Amino acid sequence: MIKRLLINFRSLGLKKTVKKIISKIFNFFSLKHYKRKKLEKDLFKIKSIEERFNKIYSTNYWLDGESRSGTGSNLKSTENIRIHLPKIIERFHIKRLFDAPCGDFNWMPQVLKNVNVDYIGSDIVEDLIISNRKNEKNNIKFVKLDIRIDKLPASDLMICRDCLFHFSYEDIFKFLDNFLISDIKYILLTSHLNTENQFENRNIVTGDFRKIDLFSKPFNFEKNYIYSFVDRDIFEIQNFKHMYLFSKSQIKNYLIKNPQKFLSEGF
């Protein structure tokens, strides 16, 4: 690539070389945008949530070269969580770790090689779980389940990273209700920093994306979380995405104070 740039520079000059580079970058991202929009049009016609996420996985919907789970699962984007997760495991004496959705297990091996835990990774996409099972060991297992409605495995900590911002309000509360009847002590959740009210929470169809603020309506979590850290995304200029650790009793209290009912998915 560098050799090609030098050839272009010698034959075209600096101005034309820069213009050509910008044009290639623009065309690349325009093509990605076109492909995404075409997939999106078909995706939200699918009524089954499981089939929707199957489609996202099978088509590489997020169009990322390193991870089919999207840029948030790249090693670069997971630098901070790979630093903080071992600290949480040690501080809170975590022995059983439940990771859902686990995605394509791209970054988690970097954590597991340095901690002593029993790990269960889970996702709604069966083909993804089948692929992940090549990584199974005595202390590493994978199971297919729907975190909204299926029984969650007993564990000390559940990681639910980069998930709720893809869920409708109804499905978020379904999951939280399901979490409350589980035998899980702590949960690590993604939320976006919104100190200056840069955005308002909005409802979506599950499988889509929007930023989410768990400390604003309709969730209204209290800011008495146990632990937090910046969960950097390589495409964010500012560090808006954070992860927050809560106990199950905290989640229960939030939901008791702010009961919400959504009759159907979406709006």
Where in this protein do the model-derived segments appear?
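Hydrophobic adenine-recognition pocket in adenosine-nucleotide-binding enzymes
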Residues: 163
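Class I (Rossmann-like) S-adenosyl-L-methionine-dependent methyltransferase catalytic domain
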Residues: 5-155, 167-267
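A conserved beta-strand element that flanks and buttresses the S-adenosyl-L-methionine
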Residues: 159
